[in-house]
UniProtKB/Swiss-Prot annotation:
<feature type="region of interest" description="Disordered">
    <location>
        <begin position="264"/>
        <end position="283"/>
    </location>
</feature>
<protein>
    <recommendedName>
        <fullName>Ubiquitin-like domain-containing protein CIP73</fullName>
    </recommendedName>
</protein>
<dbReference type="GO" id="GO:0051787">
    <property type="term" value="F:misfolded protein binding"/>
</dbReference>
<feature type="compositionally biased region" description="Basic and acidic residues">
    <location>
        <begin position="525"/>
        <end position="535"/>
    </location>
</feature>
<dbReference type="InterPro" id="IPR029071">
    <property type="entry name" value="Ubiquitin-like_domsf"/>
</dbReference>
<feature type="compositionally biased region" description="Low complexity">
    <location>
        <begin position="597"/>
        <end position="617"/>
    </location>
</feature>
<comment type="subunit">
    <text>Interacts with CCAMK.</text>
</comment>
<dbReference type="GO" id="GO:0031593">
    <property type="term" value="F:polyubiquitin modification-dependent protein binding"/>
</dbReference>
<dbReference type="InterPro" id="IPR019956">
    <property type="entry name" value="Ubiquitin_dom"/>
</dbReference>
<feature type="region of interest" description="Disordered">
    <location>
        <begin position="499"/>
        <end position="554"/>
    </location>
</feature>
<dbReference type="InterPro" id="IPR000626">
    <property type="entry name" value="Ubiquitin-like_dom"/>
</dbReference>
<dbReference type="GO" id="GO:0036503">
    <property type="term" value="P:ERAD pathway"/>
</dbReference>
<dbReference type="GO" id="GO:0071818">
    <property type="term" value="C:BAT3 complex"/>
</dbReference>
<dbReference type="GO" id="GO:0005634">
    <property type="term" value="C:nucleus"/>
</dbReference>
<feature type="region of interest" description="Disordered">
    <location>
        <begin position="645"/>
        <end position="691"/>
    </location>
</feature>
<feature type="compositionally biased region" description="Polar residues">
    <location>
        <begin position="499"/>
        <end position="523"/>
    </location>
</feature>
<keyword id="KW-0539">Nucleus</keyword>
Amino acid sequence: MGSNGTEEITSDISTGNAATTIEIKIKMLDSQTFTLRVDKQMPVPALKAQIESLTGVMSERQRLICQGKVLKDDQLLSAYHVEDGHTLHLVARHPDLTPPGSLPNHSATEPNSSTGHGYSNQVAPGVFIETFNVPVQGDGVPSEINRIVSAVLGSMGLPNFASGGEGIFVREHDSTGLGRTSDFTGNPSRPQPEQAGFRISSDSSRNSFGFPAAVSLGSLGSLQPPVIPDSLTTLLQYLSHINHEFDTIAREGGNNVQAAEAHRNEERGFVSSRLSSTPEGLSSPASLAEVLLSTRRVIIEQAGECLLQLARQLENHADIADPLSRSSTQSRALRTGVMFYNLGAYLLELGRTTMTLRLGQTPSEAVVNGGPAVFISPSGPNHIMVQPLPFQPGASFGAIPVGAAQSNSSLGGGLGSSFFPRRIDIQIRRGASTTPGTNQEEHGDTQSASVQRNTGESSVNQTTSRRPDASIAGEPGVRVVPIRTMVAAVPVLGRFQSSVNTNNEQGSQPASQQHTAPHSTAEFTLHRQSMEDSARNGTLPTPNTQQEPSSSRVVNINILSAGGPENNESERQVPSSVLQFLRALFPGGEIHVEDPSSQGTTAGVTSAATSSGAAQAPEAEPNVSEEGIFLSNLLRGIMPVISQHIGRGGDSSEDQVTRDPSTQVEIGAGTSRRQSDSESSPPNSKRQKME
C-alpha cells in the first residue's frame, strides 16, 4: 500500500445479499488500486469509512468520482449506477483546508499570517487574492508607479483594483464553497448579504471563466514563468466553465441560489483536484476517456435541457404579450447562442485532441500527444482568422458581442469590410481600346448595360443581402449574412462588333455627345444576345454585321458595396488575388476598376465623366503613345487566332484585316476619329456587294 506502482488490495466489506453485492475498484492518483466488494445500497459515507481503513485518507478529505460525477454523502451507490467492475477515482483534498465547522477566528491576526502555512513559491490551492488595492495619488505615490504596478498585475490576470482602500484581501475557500475573507488587519468576515450577489457575479465573470485571478501571496515575491498546459487540462477547465454557464441558464429565475453556488464550487473543486494529478495521467487514454464521458454528460443532460427550455419558450412566444417576458426570452436566446458557440469551439479542440491519440503496440506505448490547445483557452474560445463578426477584445464565456453593429443606425461603426454586403461585378468585353479621356461615355453605357444584365441574372446567380429600395450608406433594419458573388461574362473569340461599338466611338466626339444612353444600352443588349445565340449554334453571324477593326480584351470591374462613404479606400479595392487571376486568364488585357459606391466616382484608371469632352482631351493626350504600343503588341498576339477563324469562310476581308494593323492601332487609341470613320467605308461597300 506504500508502493508508488500499481498495487491491488482486495477487501470484502459487503453486508448485503449476493444479488446486490458488486466488486468495485478504488484508484488513487499514485496508481494504487484497491478492490472492494460492497453493497449497491451502501451509503457513500459508509464507503468512505471503509476506504479510510484501507488507505488512511480521512473520509472528510475523500472525494470519490465515478463516471465524471462526484459522489455526495447524502446518496447511495445505486444512485450513481455503480455496477460490478466499475472504477472509482479517489482524490484527496488539500490537508490545510479546514472543515466548515472549525473555522478559527484568529486565522489572520498578523499581517504575515498568510505566509505561515508554507506557501513560499508555489500556487497554493485555497488561498486567492480577491482585491489588491494600490494607493492613489493622494497617498504620496506617483501615478507612474500605479500604472507600472497595474500593468504588471494586469499581465498576471488580476482584475482591476479599487482605489479607495488599503491592504490585500485574501479569500479562503472552505469545503462548503462559500468561503471567508480576511485582510491584513486581521478581521475575518463572512460576505454580507448585499455583497454576496456581487461576489457571485464576480466569480461568474472572472474566476469561473478561467481568468487566472487566483494567485498565491508568496508568488508575488518571485514570479515564475507560466507553464502552458496541455490540451486535456484546458479541455477540463473549459468544460467546467461550460458546465457552470449551463447551470446558470438552467437555474435562471430560481430561488435556490446557495445550492447553485455550492454545486458550482463543488464542480470547481472537482476540476482543480483533477488538474492536480500527475502529468502522466493527463496524457493517458484513460484521461481522454474521462473527458469524453464528462462531455457526453454535459451535452445530454445540460445542453439538451437548455435547448429544450429555449425551444418551449420560442414555441409559445406568440402567446406572450408582456415586453419584459419577451425581453427575457431574447436575452436567454442570446446567452444560449453564445454558449453553443463556445461549445462548438470545445468540440473542435476535443476532436483535434482525439485525433492525436496513439495506442501503440502495447499499453505502455499509449499516449495522447495533443500538445497545447489550439481552438480554446482556459478563458474562452480562441478567435480564428475568419469570423462572422469582428474580434471583440476580452470576449470569452458570457460575453455577447452585440450592440456594436447598431451604432449610428448603420453598419459602419468600426466594423471591418467583411461585414458589409458587397457585390463584385466583372464584365469582360471585346472592343476598341481607347484612352480614359475619350471613352467616358462608353464606360457609362457599359456600366448601365452591366447593371441591367446583373439585375436579370440575380435570381439565378446571386442572392442580394440588402433591400433594393434602401439606401446604401445608412440602411436601417435587420441585415442578413453578406454574400459576395462574382459574375464574369467571358467573350467568344470570334465575336464581331456591332454598330453600337461604332456609335460608342462616335459618341465620344463633342458633336454627338447628346444621344441617349438607353438607346445604346438596348442595342448593346440585343447585340450581345445575338452573339451568344450564334456562338451556341456554332455559326458565324450574318454578313450584314461589321467586322471588328481592332479586337482587344477590356475588363471592367464594378464594386458595389453597402458600406458607402464610410468604407476606407483600401476596403473598396478589388482583392489582389482577383486581379492576378484576371491577368493570368487574359494576358495583355486591359483592366479597368470602377467603384460606383463612392458617389459616382470611379477608382482605378477610369476617371469621372464630365460634361465637356474637349476638356478631357488634353488630360488623355500623354497616355496615347502607351496605349498604342500596348494595343500593337496585343494585336501581334491575337492576329494568328483571328486569321484562323475568319479564314475558314474564304472571305477577302482577311487580307483587309491583316493588311492594315497600324490603322487599327490608331482607331483603338482614339487619335483620329475622322480617319476611323473614313476607313470604315470599304467594309460597308463589300457588305453591299455581298447582299
